[in-house]
Design a protein with these regions (language model features):
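Outer-membrane beta-barrel proteins and related beta-barrel translocases across Gram-negative bacteria
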Residues: 62-79, 85-117, 123-130, 137-694
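Charged (often Lys/Glu-rich) extended helix/loop segments that serve as interaction or gating elements
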Residues: 1-121
Length: 694
């Protein structure tokens, strides 16, 4: 350590070479700073005698206070009376006496530990405290060790530990117990979760969570590992319960990615479950379909490559995995070129797709309108040339291309086995943007646009497997074909007419509205009524985005039919400020028997968090089924947090009712003592003395 610097009102050196400093004494050595009322230094013993109030700070958030002390010259060893150790300006450890050992350990005897604010004018004990015969703080290891520790709420003893070790608040990765949770569920009973975190090394960790209740014995787990060029995570659970007493139940979700050679990225996602109801019974997920996937891809400025395999599993009552496309293989290659001879941009694409159903029945045995065992393979290629011209204020874009495909169908006695196509495409897009600066500083943009498009060839007779559900929105308004996959294409002449108006003002409010309609020479038979694209005249599309300076953002999309009735509507919104964060959505879709949607779909979803004051926060999450006229799920939470404790209560009600799912209610309670690493709540400003919390 470097030389020490001493500052005081009065400094004297006695005849026996002792140094005595009095009045506002400050001593500095390295990062360590000491203040006291008086210091007497004996050079023969190398010891300092200090008179308080004494404060020692090491520059890392550790502060030691005392009434009297005797320390070594480097302040790394010594004895302190009436000591109080403060960690990170939050956790306080008060003791009759303390000793410092080698600048690393601070041993405190007959200790009281709390992070609650203690006021001289408030005679009540702190909300919580840990009393211990001895406490050792390892500053280097960032650990706190307790001997014969007793947890008290106010002055009432609650728990006792012969030995206890907890990390301090600066420690972010340390083996130990995390926040426990008391959980009550209408189906699983009342139970207790106690997570235990194991730091295997700086790059790997494992969390094991025993969950014990009246009706279940469950072990939850999570494993994470980071690599130089990737990461993996596995999470799941294994259960023996009274719901299915003869079965061992469980689930596994795994995912990860790795950067490999030549800019390729390998990604995987595995989703497995023992039975259809397990995820819902234990509130692990609300998914009703699982998709496990592995893919390798590369994205560059003018090139994209992807190869993937997907395995699908349904958890729905009305779906049978044997007649669903359970295995899907896809390969995609896209390339952009900019030929100087032609000008503009040349886009090339090739795609291969194959899916199969486990069933080998080559007809519709279950009567759902789809052949039970149908398998399909297709190969598609596409080449398109695009060029944009500017004629005054008019922007014109031309698109010329050709598309081809080969299709093979097996295990289907009702369809041809092979089919192919080679079709030309062409389009002309016109835009005329107009800009005006308003007197209020806002900028107004009006852009009418129109597209005339044509795709040759005839509609395929192969089954429509991938394009049964079509969305019509602003994103595909000017597409040549609005089917989601190449197994179907729009044919013949079509025209798209619309306009966009925008008001842009970052200091006030901004709004963008787009409206338009598609007109066709011939109706497309594979567009159903819910797509909004059936017939020779599509539904009218109206979409918009609104953003206010105060934090409100709205996005909406609506389709109107010829009678100006709404056939599909979607509205999403979010509003956030310092105290409030609210999000919600509304969706409505008319019935469409052609895609086995025999009822209207209507839903309202709301989630929000409101901070009542600096201590109280309330949250609500709800999903309401408009058609059924009932709530689908509802969840509410309440959090109380001050400088020393965080208490969270959560209640959730699921109204699902089917052969595998039953309505259930769950209640969860978590309690966290602030000041330790296992606390995950945000820091709350300590209350001021003189304002007692009731």
């Amino acid at each position: 350590m470097g030389p020490a610097v001493l500052v005081a009102d009065d400094i004297q050196i006695t005849v026996d070479r002792r140094l005595i400093a009095t009045g506002n004494v400050e001593a500095f050595q390295g990062q360590t700073r000491l203040t006291a009322q008086a210091i007497a230094y004996n050079p023969d013993t190398g010891r300092m005698t200090l008179t308080g109030p004494i404060t020692i700070e090491d520059g890392t958030g550790v502060r030691l206070l005392a009434d009297q002390a005797e320390l070594s010259r480097d302040m790394q060893n010594g004895l302190l009376l009436g000591a109080r150790l403060v960690l990170n300006e939050q956790l306080q450890l008060a003791a009759v006496q303390a000793s410092r050992v080698n600048g690393r350990y601070t041993q405190l005897y007959k200790t009281v530990v709390t992070s609650c604010t203690i006021c001289a004018d408030d005679p009540r004990p702190p909300l919580w405290q840990i009393r211990a015969k001895r406490v050792v703080y390892d500053e280097q290891g960032q650990q706190i060790y307790f001997d014969h520790a007793q947890l008290r709420i106010r002055s009432v003893p609650v728990f006792y530990w012969p030995r206890l070790r907890v990390p301090d608040q600066k420690q972010t990765r340390v083996t130990g117990v995390l926040l426990p949770e008391i959980r009550s569920d209408s189906r699983l009973g009342t139970g207790f979760k106690l997570p235990y975190f194991i730091a295997l090394n700086p790059h790997r960790d494992l969390t094991l969570t025993p969950y014990l209740s009246n009706n279940t014995r469950t072990l939850e787990f999570r494993y994470r590992e980071k690599f130089v060029r990737g990461e993996i995570i596995f999470e799941g659970a294994v259960s023996k319960d009274e719901l299915l007493p003869d079965d061992t139940r469980g689930y596994l979700f795994a995912g990860g990615w790795f950067d490999v050679k030549r800019d390729f990225r390998l990604q995987f996602d595995v989703e497995l479950v023992s039975d259809d109801a397990y995820l819902s019974d234990y509130d692990y997920s609300d998914r009703d379909r699982l998709d496990s996937q592995i893919q390798i891809s590369r994205a560059r400025r003018d090139e994209f490559i992807r190869l993937s395999y997907i395995n699908l599993k349904s958890l729905r009552d009305d779906e049978d995995d044997n007649v669903l496309p359970s295995n899907v293989i896809e390969a995609l290659y896209e390339k952009r070129l900019f030929p100087s001879a032609l000008g503009g941009e040349l886009r090339l694409a090739a795609e291969a797709h194959a899916h199969d159903r486990p069933s080998s029945v080559d007809f519709d045995q279950n009567g759902d309108g789809v052949v039970d065992g149908r398998d399909m393979l297709r190969l598609n290629v596409e080449a398109e040339w695009l060029r944009t011209f500017q004629i005054g204020g008019l922007q014109a874009q031309t698109r010329l291309g050709i598309v081809g495909g080969v299709y093979e169908v097996t295990d289907d006695a009702t369809s041809p086995e092979d089919e192919s196509e080679l079709s030309p495409t062409a389009a002309l897009i016109l835009r005329y943007p107009m800009v005006k600066q308003g007197g209020d500083g806002a900028r107004h943009i009006l852009e009418p646009f129109a597209q005339l498009a044509w795709i040759g060839g005839d509609t395929l007779t192969t089954p429509n497997e991938e394009s049964t559900r079509v969305e019509f929105d602003q994103g595909n308004f000017l597409s040549l074909s609005r089917f989601p996959a190449p197994d179907r294409r729009e044919r013949g002449w079509s025209a798209a007419i619309g306009a966009t108006w925008s008001r842009i003002d970052p200091d006030s409010w901004s709004l963008s509205v787009t409206g338009g309609q598609i007109l066709r020479q011939d109706a497309q038979p594979d567009f159903t009524s819910s797509s909004g694209l059936s017939g020779t005249q599509s539904d009218f599309l109206l979409s918009g985005q609104l953003r206010l300076k105060g934090g409100l953002a709205l996005t909406g999309r609506t389709l109107f039919d010829d009678s100006f009735d709404v056939t599909k509507a979607e509205l999403r919104g979010n509003w956030s400020n310092q105290r409030l964060n609210v999000g919600g959505s509304y969706i409505w879709i008319d019935e469409d028997p052609a895609i086995e949607q025999f009822d209207d779909i209507g839903e309202i979803k709301f989630d929000g968090i409101y901070r009542i004051d600096r201590n109280w926060t309330v949250g609500l999450d709800m999903r309401y089924d408009i058609v059924a006229g009932r709530t689908a799920t509802a969840e509410a939470g309440l959090i109380y947090q001050n400088e020393c404790v965080r208490v969270g209560v959560r209640v959730k009600r699921s109204f699902a009712d089917s052969t595998t799912l039953e309505p259930s209610t769950s209640l969860g309670l978590t309690v966290s003592l602030n000041g330790f690493s296992m606390n995950t709540g945000e820091r709350v400003e300590a209350r001021s003395c003189g304002k007692h919390t009731k």
